[in-house]
């Protein structure tokens, strides 16, 4: 069997109707959403299946929805392929919480409430319309970091997601981000695309949210991971609960080092990356980071059935 990693997507991968066909074949999907709904106090499965999209896209609802979707797919995987165990896990931003639940670190219901709170705190930290995020395509990291420094002028703007070589996301105060995006274009970026988000994640504007999240996180029991989980902030697999807590708090205002995460997996002998969650965002990034890695996304019956042959 090939050595494989499981990776879990973050916000942007959600879609109304996700997991519908898996739910028809595997009752554990709706059972998982029922547990999430009990923790939240509203019907999450109904929101995910019926929408509307503008409700699902509110960050405090997106985050529990994606966490529940990834955990549901993972539980289906464990039912169908108990013999197929990943050697390592990681998640992109919110996906780190999915990875920690699937690695046995955080109780599922605790995590659902935690990511709902994370979404609310993130939204409260920056009034809607005052922050922005742009994807910068086709410019090297150093040039982007320099553009952000030049654009600051006393405001927050920084590189926040190192997604793949030539794809970096910047975030911060709206005007500063727009200045930085223009400077990136001047420096030779192919494109600077505004992202449809209500919150500028992973920049210094999220520090107040992180401080409040820390208080709640302190009261949650964390277990030792059954599978190593590489974190976003240091690309390290922490085993002590204090370190895992600190990494989750820092994650809110620190860059997601995804390129390095995938490179580390490849260096450690991983041959296949399996994305557990809706969409194919991480699958697409993998091929741009390490071309020789195989990548697949498992989010419906067809992809679930096909994965065994890929890992053989």
Go through the PLM ranges and name each one.
Residues 185, 266-269:
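Non-catalytic positions within long, well-ordered alpha-helices that form the structural scaffold/packing
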Residues 23-24, 150-152, 185-187, 288-291, ...:
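Short, solvent-exposed amphipathic alpha-helical segments in soluble enzyme
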Residues 62-64, 200, 255:
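Glycine-rich phosphate/pyrophosphate-binding beta-alpha loops
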Residues 234, 294-312:
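Short, flexible loop segments at boundaries between secondary-structure elements
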């Amino acid at each position: 069997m090939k050595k494989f990693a499981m990776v879990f997507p973050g916000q942007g991968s959600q879609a109304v109707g996700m997991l519908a066909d898996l739910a028809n074949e595997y009752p554990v999907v709706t059972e998982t959403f029922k547990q999430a709904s009990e923790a939240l106090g509203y019907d999450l499965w109904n929101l995910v299946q019926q929408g509307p999209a503008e409700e699902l896209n509110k960050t405090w609802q997106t985050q529990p929805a994606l966490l529940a979707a990834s955990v549901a797919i993972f539980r289906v995987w464990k039912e169908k392929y108990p013999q197929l165990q990943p050697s390592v896990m990681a998640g992109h931003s919110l996906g780190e919480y999915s990875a920690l639940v699937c690695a046995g670190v955080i109780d599922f219901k605790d995590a659902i409430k935690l990511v709902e709170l994370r979404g609310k705190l993130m939204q409260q930290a920056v009034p809607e319309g005052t922050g922005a995020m742009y994807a910068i395509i086709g410019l090297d990291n150093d040039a982007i970091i320099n553009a952000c420094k030049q654009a600051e002028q006393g405001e927050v703007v920084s590189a926040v997601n190192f997604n793949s070589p030539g794809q970096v996301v910047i975030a911060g105060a709206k005007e500063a981000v727009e200045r930085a995006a223009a400077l990136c274009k001047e420096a030779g970026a192919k494109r600077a695309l505004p992202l449809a988000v209500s919150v500028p994640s992973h920049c210094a504007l999220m520090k107040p949210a992180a401080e409040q999240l820390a208080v709640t996180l302190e009261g949650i029991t964390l277990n030792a991971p059954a599978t190593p989980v590489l974190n976003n902030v240091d690309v390290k697999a922490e085993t002590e609960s204090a370190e895992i807590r600190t990494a989750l708090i820092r994650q809110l205002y620190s860059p997601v080092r995804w390129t390095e995460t995938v490179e580390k997996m490849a260096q450690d002998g991983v041959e296949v990356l399996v994305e557990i969650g809706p969409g194919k965002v991480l699958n697409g990034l993998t091929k741009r980071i390490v071309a020789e890695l195989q990548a697949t996304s498992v989010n419906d019956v067809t992809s679930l059935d096909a994965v065994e042959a890929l890992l053989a």
